[in-house]
Amino acid sequence: MVQKQYRFAPKSIFTFVFLCFVAIVVIISTSSLVQVEESLDPIEVSDEIKKHDRKVVIFPSNFQSANNKLADFLTEAFGQRLNKGDIVYKNRDTYELPQTVYTWNTIDLFQSIGEKDNLKCEKIPLNFEISKIYNKNADLYKILRDFKNENSFYYKEVSVFFPDLGKQLRERTIEKHWFQLIGSSVWLEQYGVHLMISRVIYTKTGNKVQPVISLSYVQAFDRNWTELKNVTLVVPDSGKAKFKTVSYPSFIPIPVYHNVNQQRGKFYGVEDPRIMLVKNKEGYEEPLIVYNSFNRSPPNANYLEEIKNLVKLDTYRSIFMAWIWRTQLGKSNVGSSLPDLATTDDHKYVKVKELSLPNKKRPKTEKNWTPFVIYEDQKKQGYDSHLYFIYSFQDLSILKCSLWDAGNCIWEYRMNNKKTKISELRGGTELMNVNQLLDKYNFAGLETVKDQFKGKEVWISFARAALSKCGCGSKMYRPNFTVLVKQGGRFQLSFVSSYMDFGVPILPWAKGKGLCNGKNLLIPNGISNWVLAKDEGGGFQDYMTLSLSRSDSTVDIIHMKGILKSILSEYLLQTNRDVLNNNAIHCALLESESYCKSYAENYRAHLKRWQN
């Protein structure tokens, strides 16, 4: 084999020395990129990022490569250039229990006993501990300025709905027209970060009930809930045995139907996104969001006339699923195959799928489906093949929808076959599977606890009751704790709580107005994580983080502990297979109405004392 020889002949010894110095600096700088994780523990890495706002690239903890090869892989596989000070590491962060102060909290649960004509609302106390509320709203001025400066294809597509953004940035009037709300997050164990999605809405008038468009904003937080301002995750590229990168924070391009010429009575974009983890066929967990959005009727009309505003096509508010680490070309599956949007066919959007009721029924508006997975299915198959939804809490109705295949959803369970009536109790968070949580741990004494769940699956969630004109404002929303049990092929909404507020300070709907002017809202959005840990007495304790929003203008979290221990009694886990009624809901709503009236009375009394 002939070896090529390269001769280096510098014009001067000074040039030679200088070039050697530069080469040494480059080598040292590049080496430092991947040595950070070897020399610092995860907390110190996080502290370095916070101090210097550096770019950080995180590989999953199971990535098959040595630490000192990560930077090379990043450059060779993705062509990404690294700068001096950038941090590249393979995750070894574990979940950090919240370091906070807790106070006791009690709510009342109701179960399904008696008949509707002879309603018995027996209260069962549920005791647990709560922290104060923590706000996680982003700097809207900064993120919108960055979005505008990026000038991506997605920004160009949606910015026609907010042409005054530049003026609003210059005049510092962003807070009058833009709001961030409905944050929902998951803990990515392989990456050691909390991944949160929220809505950023624009309203031309400044009125939150008259939004023009809703954008989806994704952020990553470290295990201590400090935002990572410039983070890239190396994630699997599904089905290709390869990897790709995703960077946060960012507005993600979820494909939606919209028409700038038809805005009257329309609210475009992604509404109420809820994020959760599903286990895919490749065997790893990936984030999935469920949301609702306008969708146009099947393409059977004159598109050109629609653009010219000569015809008005039927639109529907449909439920969608979106795989935020997967992509699709174009947006034809959301009813946007219009001539003026032809260029979108070449753009990569987040992969989405519309969900349809059995028999292709298509109501005008679909909202508030409550998602969950059946853990027994996952154990048998090795992955989640379907996502299930509580379609209606009253007259309990549950849908089964394929995660990976086409086709309509089917009814998995219906309390009765009558037309489902949507009650005041509606979807809030996803349902968290208690069996799945317990199976992750093998603490001493936990087997006795697991025995209580043999032959049944149990889920908990925080729904929300929407009460109109109950005494305080036009509408009041608060969380309602629920327990769902599946046993012998039958589902039962075993327990529902009255309104609960966690002692959180409520914000007025409009600045300068009273708490009972307009809407009075505290909405549960998602269960961010739920873990077990050993306690000092040799037993265990459970810790949960819940995301909330107040007055449709905040992204908040609150920590709780002891919920699982409180429901771990034979009494609370029993199901009466002969009882099929809505009594738990009826009792919870009656008590919630009493809460609303008492809240209004106390607020007015407080105002009177303050005025005097």
From Swiss-Prot:
Glycans are attached at residues 224, 230, 480. InterPro entries: BMT1. The keyword Transferase applies. GO terms for molecular function: mannosyltransferase activity. GO terms for cellular component: membrane. It is found in: Membrane. GO terms for biological process: cell wall organization; glycosphingolipid biosynthetic process. It is a single-pass type II membrane protein. Induction: Expression is induced in biofilm. Its EC number is 2.4.1.-. Its main location: membrane. The chain crosses the membrane at residues 13-33. Pfam families: BMT. Keywords: Cell wall biogenesis/degradation, Glycoprotein, Glycosyltransferase, Membrane, Signal-anchor, Transferase, Transmembrane, Transmembrane helix. Residues 1-12 are cytoplasmic. Residues 34-612 are extracellular. Beta-mannosyltransferase involved in cell wall biosynthesis. Required for beta-1,2-mannose transfer on phospholipomannan. Belongs to the BMT family. This is Beta-mannosyltransferase 5. It comes from Candida albicans (strain SC5314 / ATCC MYA-2876) (Yeast). The gene is BMT5.
